[in-house]
Amino acid sequence: MAATNGDAELTVAEEAKEEEEATDDGGGGVSSQWLRAAVLGASDGLVSTAALMLGIGAARPADARAVLLSGLAGLVAGACSMAIGEYVSVHVQLDVELADLERRRRRGGPAPAGLGLHAAAAAVSRPGQAAAASALSFAAGAALPLLAAWFVAGAYRVRVVVVVATASLALAAFGAAGARLGRAPGGRAGLRVVVGGLLAMAATYGVMKLFRTHGV
């Protein structure tokens, strides 16, 4: 008899739990994966929102309101995009693994040992939870440069310095934290993340500055 969808989901979850217990000592458990995903989501939100604010500021340096509203719009849009993408991804991954499990059982073969922690642990019957986690991590990262600029009263150059400094410090912390979760040295990883974020912000700022210079 073919396995029902509920039985298949239960089996996938049980196998994921066994794999988690086997790999937890090596830093590859589900908890570590969730934390690393949260760090990546926060870094994504931080870089994209800071770059967006700097870009709008380069085009309209005298309009502080436009800069803040662009950051807020980036936070909301990015969080929604992350949530929807994670929700769809989780369902697709789960459907693929459940279909593979059922095909193996119909052929009378053994169930695969370790179907994938992402779909099994994070998505079985809880795609909404995975979507919410992605949205919240993105929003948390995006809120940092937005709040930094919000509470700064001064010239545009001052806001730029504050946003870049806040983003750099936070990126260094996120990069180091992600490396530590994988039991790797955090210093070099943090530096790489900071350099990447600064390049993204500089590119956005430069392009928008070019458009403003040419009167576009």
Curated annotation (Swiss-Prot):
Bilayer topology: Multi-pass membrane protein
Pfam family, one: VIT1
Residue numbers on the Cytoplasmic membrane side: 1-36, 87-134, 179-190
Intervals, Vacuolar compartment: 58-65, 156-157, 212-216
Protein keywords: Ion transport, Iron, Iron transport, Membrane, Transmembrane, Transmembrane helix, Transport, Vacuole
InterPro entries on file: Ccc1_fam
Protein name listed in UniProt: Vacuolar iron transporter homolog 4
Species, as recorded: Oryza sativa subsp. japonica (Rice)
